[in-house]
Amino acid sequence: MQVLVASRNKKKLAELQRVLAAANVEGIELLSLADVPEYPETPETGATFEANARIKALDGVRNAGLPTVADDSGLAVDALNGMPGVLSARWCGAHGEDAENNRLLLAQLSDVPDDRRGARFVSSCVLAVPAEIADAADLEPEVAVTGEWEGRILRAEQGTNGFGYDPLFEPAEAPGQSSAELTPERKDELSHRGKALQQLVPALRVLAQSAQ
């Protein structure tokens, strides 16, 4: 069963592959947006992570005709009243500029003491399935899940793994380390996206079994 991951980020594709392998789910071939004919993507105008993930997942079903997993993730900082939130990827105004986003966040928190630098990563994932495939598998056409990862914002970047705000995020479970210093397997276990993807495993297992 081919399943589209609505992203061109190879690390996100690899993350879901590791989650499926750890759960012994076989029979799923993951494709990225680079593997299917290009299609016009609907702007992510949702006010929540789940709304944006749903937009991307339904785009995949409508244009590629495949079951599609999409996520929208971001950072919620207590001292910034939950921002950057859904604006995380374009916090500095340019989508995908990780270094600029990180510099801006550090500047905004420069006067915030360590005990008030609490933050969490949030990931909402949506699995959308074409109606005929959902009916055959006795599966809901949409499955939405959310994972959160608590921690705090460091005062300087640490580590070279991961992407986005990972070098600035100190997980509650790993004091003194950033999430960019964790192994991929440890990050899958702890992270917001890993937690969300693990909740999708039962539905993906049903899809795989329905194709056998």
UniProtKB/Swiss-Prot annotation:
Substrate binds at S7, R8, N9, K10, K11, K12, S73, F163, G164, Y165, D166, K187, H192, R193. It comes from the Bacteria. GO terms for cellular component: cytosol. The keyword Metal-binding applies. Its cofactor is Mg(2+). Binds 1 Mg(2+) ion per subunit. Keywords: Hydrolase, Magnesium, Metal-binding, Nucleotide metabolism, Nucleotide-binding. Gene3D superfamilies: 3.90.950.10. It catalyses: XTP + H2O = XMP + diphosphate + H(+); dITP + H2O = dIMP + diphosphate + H(+); ITP + H2O = IMP + diphosphate + H(+). Residues 164-194 are annotated as: Disordered. Residues 183-192 have a biased composition (Basic and acidic residues). The active site is at D72 (proton acceptor). It is an enzyme of class 3 (hydrolase). Mg(2+) binds at D72. GO terms for biological process: nucleotide metabolic process; purine nucleoside triphosphate catabolic process. Its EC number is 3.6.1.66. InterPro entries: dITP/XTP_pyrophosphatase (IPR020922), ITPase-like_fam (IPR029001), RdgB/HAM1 (IPR002637). GO terms for molecular function: dITP diphosphatase activity; ITP diphosphatase activity; metal ion binding; nucleotide binding; ribonucleoside triphosphate phosphatase activity; XTP diphosphatase activity. Belongs to the HAM1 NTPase family. Pyrophosphatase that catalyzes the hydrolysis of nucleoside triphosphates to their monophosphate derivatives, with a high preference for the non-canonical purine nucleotides XTP (xanthosine triphosphate), dITP (deoxyinosine triphosphate) and ITP. Seems to function as a house-cleaning enzyme that removes non-canonical purine nucleotides from the nucleotide pool, thus preventing their incorporation into DNA/RNA and avoiding chromosomal lesions. Homodimer. This is dITP/XTP pyrophosphatase. It comes from Corynebacterium urealyticum (strain ATCC 43042 / DSM 7109).
